[in-house]
Curated annotation (Swiss-Prot):
Record carries keyword Acetylation: yes
Protein species of origin: Rattus norvegicus (Rat)
Gene3D superfamilies: DNA helicase RuvA subunit, C-terminal domain, Endonuclease/exonuclease/phosphatase
Cofactor: Mg(2+); Mn(2+)
Main location: nucleus
Site (Interaction with 5' end of substrate DNA): 184, 303, 321, 355
Protein known as: Tyrosyl-DNA phosphodiesterase 2
Residues at which Mg(2+) binds: 128, 158
Gene: Tdp2
EC number per UniProt: 3.1.4.-
GO molecular function, one term: single-stranded DNA binding
GO cellular component terms attached to this protein's record: cytoplasm; nucleolus; nucleus; PML body
Source organism, top-level taxon: Eukaryota
Amino acid sequence: MASGSSSDAAESAEPAAAPAAAETEEDQVKRRRLQSLGFALVTSCDTTVASTFLSENNWQTKKALSAFFEQPENDLARPHQPPTSSKSEDYVDLTNEDANDTTILETSPSGTPLEDSSTISFITWNIDGLDGCNLPERARGVCSCLALYSPDVVFLQEVIPSYCAYLRKRARTYNIITGNEEGYFTAILLKKGRVKFKGQEIIPFPNTKMMRNLLCVNVSLGGNEFCLMTSHLESTRKHSAERINQLKTVFQKMQEATDSTTVIFAGDTNLRDQEVIKCGGLPDNVFDAWEFLGKPKHCRYTWDTKANDNLRIPAACKHRFDRIFFRAEEGHLIPQSLDLIGLERLDCGRFPSDHWGLLCTLNVVL
C-alpha cells in the first residue's frame, strides 16, 4: 500500500531553505519545454528556435507566434530550419550510420526462452527526448544501457519520432510498440524470441493538456499471460488533479485484466505520495515494487536535480516520479531487485536523461 509520510517529509525538506522557489523553478522548466514543443509543432520549426522566440516574447505564445510568422522571409538570422549542427530532436538524424557506434544490440535474435528461466527483467526510463541538446550521444548512452542489461521488456517515456527511428535501427533484437507517432510519446520494447506480442490498446486521457495516454500491450512470457502498461502522467504540481484522475484510470485498467493475467505498469507517474493517498491508495491487489522491496534508499529518487544537472535547475529537488506497480495471483510474481541506471556522465558531460532509469528483476513462480 502507498505510504505518504516519509516521502512527503522528504519533499517538504527539499530544499530546506526555499521550498517554494525550488518548486516554482522545477515547474517552470517543464512548462517551458512543453510550451516549446507545442510552438514547434505549430510552426514546423526546431524546438531551439521555438524556445528563442518564446523567451524573446516573455513566453507569451500568441506574441511569439506572431513574431515568427511576421519575420521577413530573407531574415537569415532567424531560420525556420536550424543549421545542420543544431542538436534538435526534429532535425538531428539519429539514424545515420556511425562507424564508431558500438550500441547496436547484437544479442541472439531468438533470445533465451523464458521456460529456461524463472526470472524476468525490465527497464523503465523517461529518456527526455524533448531535450535536443546532445541528443545523439544521449541516445547512444541509453542504447548502451539496453545492451549492457539486455532486459526482456523496456518501458520508455518522452520518445520522439527520430529517437524511435534510432531505436528501431539500433535495438534490433526488440519489437517496438508506441503510444503515438507524433510529438512525443511512450513506447514498450519486447525482446524478440523471449516475449511474444499478442495485442495492444491505447487508452486516451480525455482531459490531458500534454498529449498523454496509457499504452497497454498484451504478451506471453513463457506461456504466462502478461499485460504490460506504461504512461507519462500529467506533469507539474499545477496539474495534480488531472494526474490523480489519470492514475485512477491506470488502476481501473489494471483491474480489468483477467485474474490469470499478470499486470505490470511502469512509467513516469510524476506522482507525489500524497496524491496516491488522495486517489484512495493502491488497490488491495496492486503493489508498488519499491515498497514491496522495503523502500531501498539507493533507488528512491529517480528525478534528482542535485545529482543530475541536465536541466541546470539551481535549486535541489528530488522526487520518486518513476514507479512500478504490479498485480499478480498471490505469490506468482516476486520482485527481487531494483536499481537506478544511467548514472554515469557521457563524454558530453551530461547524463543520458534528466531522469534515472529503473532496472527491475522479478521471479516468476509457476
